[in-house]
């Protein structure tokens, strides 16, 4: 058989479309490939093309669940090696994806958080050492910088003179990977109850759903890591009293999407809304349009995670528990609905999941 040498540009185009797990194995194939996989241009071009999947974690294990959207629709589940020291129990552990990196925060860690890329098996611990009550919030980056400049945000509560009768003060703390240090900021978020597991990172900024306990309004807050300020992104056109907490995700890598479903509804309708325009700082009001409505019977206690794939005929993919509390992946394409139950998961007391885009971005 004649040995064919492909043009290097064609080799790159092919490798852009290879899943990260396979690429990490290819590092030992040739030195040129290994060098290529470490270049920023390749990492960024690969991230643009890679398809989202789901991360699934139980009380003791973590899995990746990729979804095949071809004609033969199926899922592929792999157990991921745990490269986070001291993490032997995932209960009350939260993972927030940020361009392929995972921000890991657990209630059992005292003022500690981890940044993790499971595909590169890289982990970095971040610790807050000041004598204040402290809560980690999430990770983002300065989108105006070529090297992104990743940062972590948290908030602290303290008493200036440490006297019981003195008032408590709140400070926003920002960790910069470039300096490996913390700084305090005089910036604050709007009042409201932050809904757990609602964080989404988009173009470096962090977004989450907040509800007002008195008016039952739901709105989206954000933190701009470039300007290091909080913003009220928008008020959602429905309230928390009538609907489950909205579930956030991204859309087309430059917009937000929301999953909306009614409480105690007579129907199983689930609505998916997306922002009409790209997210930017033009100051224009945020407009939402309905992307699709689907009828799926799921558990009333389920917290779905989802993503939208425009490559395969406007596909909506959701992971959640069905009406029998069995964890399933749902694929909606046009009028066709495919339900695939996730089996073989070791989940004694706890199970959770989120959508995630795997990448070759190294931990900063």
UniProtKB/Swiss-Prot annotation:
Residue span, F-box domain: 1-50
Annotated Kelch repeat ranges: 156-205, 328-364
Protein's UniProt keywords contain Zinc: no
UniProt entry keywords in alphabetical sequence: Kelch repeat, Repeat
InterPro entries: F-box-assoc_dom_typ1 (IPR006527), F-box-assoc_interact_dom (IPR017451), F-box-like_dom_sf (IPR036047), F-box_dom (IPR001810), SCF_F-box_component (IPR050796)
Pfam name, any one: FBA_1
Keyword Repeat recorded: yes
Record Gene3D superfamilies: 1.20.1280.50
Name of the protein in its database record: Putative F-box/kelch-repeat protein At1g12170
Organism: Arabidopsis thaliana (Mouse-ear cress)
């Amino acid at each position: 058989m004649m040995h064919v040498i492909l043009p290097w540009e064609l080799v790159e185009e092919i490798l852009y479309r290879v899943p990260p797990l396979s690429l990490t194995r290819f590092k030992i194939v040739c030195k040129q490939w290994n060098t290529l996989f470490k270049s920023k241009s390749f990492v960024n071009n690969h991230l643009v093309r890679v398809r989202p999947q789901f991360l699934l974690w139980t009380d003791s294990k973590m899995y990746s669940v990729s979804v095949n959207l071809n004609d033969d629709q199926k899922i592929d589940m792999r157990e991921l090696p745990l490269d986070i020291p001291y993490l032997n129990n995932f209960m009350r552990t939260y993972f927030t994806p940020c361009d392929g990196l995972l921000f890991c925060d657990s209630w059992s860690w005292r003022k500690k958080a981890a940044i993790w890329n499971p595909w590169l098996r890289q982990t970095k611990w971040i610790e807050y050492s000041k004598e204040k009550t402290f809560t980690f919030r999430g990770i983002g980056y300065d989108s105006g910088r070529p090297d992104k400049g990743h940062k972590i945000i948290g908030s602290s509560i303290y008493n200036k003179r440490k006297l019981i009768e003195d008032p408590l003060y709140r400070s926003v703390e920002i960790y910069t990977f470039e300096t490996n240090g913390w700084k305090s900021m005089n910036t604050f978020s709007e009042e409201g109850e932050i809904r757990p597991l609602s964080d989404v990172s988009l173009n470096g900024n962090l977004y989450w759903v907040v509800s007002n306990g008195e008016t039952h309004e739901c709105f989206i807050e954000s933190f701009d890591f470039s300007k290091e300020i909080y913003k009220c992104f928008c008020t959602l056109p429905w309230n928390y009293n009538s609907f489950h907490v909205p579930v956030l995700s991204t859309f087309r890598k430059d917009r937000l999407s929301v999953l909306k479903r009614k409480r105690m509804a007579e129907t199983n309708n689930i609505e998916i809304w997306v922002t009409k325009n790209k997210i930017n700082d033009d100051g224009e009001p945020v407009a939402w349009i309905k992307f699709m409505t689907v009828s799926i019977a799921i558990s009333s206690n389920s917290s779905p995670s989802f993503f939208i794939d425009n490559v395969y005929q406007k596909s909506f993919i959701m992971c959640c528990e069905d009406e029998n509390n069995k964890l399933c992946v749902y694929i909606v394409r046009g009028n066709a609905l495919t339900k695939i139950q996730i089996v073989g998961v070791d989940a004694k007391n706890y199970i959770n999941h989120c959508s995630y885009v795997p990448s070759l971005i190294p931990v900063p």
